[in-house]
A protein has these predicted regions:
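Short glycine-rich anion-binding loops that position phosphate/pyrophosphate groups of nucleotides
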Residues: 12, 66-67, 122-125
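Residue-level detection of beta-strand scaffold positions
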Residues: 4, 21-24, 59, 79-83, ...
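N-terminal beta-alpha supersecondary unit
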Residues: 1-65
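Phosphate-handling active-site elements
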Residues: 49-58, 85-94, 109-112
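Surface "functional belts" at beta-alpha junctions
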Residues: 23, 32-35, 90-137
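DPxDG-like acidic metal-binding loop motif
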Residues: 62-96
Length: 137
């Protein structure tokens, strides 16, 4: 049984989730905006307390690695690195735009030649964007 702590801070949403064998067992989100420095520590503490209280060994930490808010990314990656260093577990970097494409692939029947173009607001009338095929290539 594998348990992964998931951290998302690349957008205006700050979220921490824990999953065990692909099933979500803990979720905390702040949808109000850029307060990651305040929310993340509390959310991670609650998630680790939940995991430890259920005697579930934490196997890895996954963190969004951008693109996205530079400050948000630094906060999330720093927290993830600290947890991994302290517990001697692997750190998994997850491309933010790739993750945004996954629900579309899972829940929609797309033609073989479909292209996906996830976007995140980069502010100042710009966006972070990528183009993926159905294999996320």
């Amino acid at each position: 049984m594998s348990c992964i702590l998931n951290i998302e801070t690349s957008t205006s949403v700050c979220s921490v989730a824990a999953s065990q064998d692909g099933q979500t067992i803990f979720v905390k989100e702040d949808l109000k905006g850029p307060s990651h420095a305040v929310s993340l520590g509390v959310f991670v503490d609650e998630a680790l307390s939940f995991i430890d209280s259920h005697a579930i060994p934490l196997d890895a930490v996954a963190v969004s690695c951008g693109p996205g808010s530079y400050t948000g990314l630094r906060i999330g990656v720093s927290m993830a690195k600290g947890i991994c260093y302290g517990r001697n577990i692997p750190l998994i970097g997850i491309p933010t735009l790739e993750v945004l494409s996954v629900p579309v692939l899972l829940y929609h029947d797309l033609p073989e030649n479909a292209l996906l173009c996830p976007m995140i607001d980069a502010r100042r009338m710009e966006v972070y964007a990528a183009v993926y095929d159905r294999r996320l290539q």
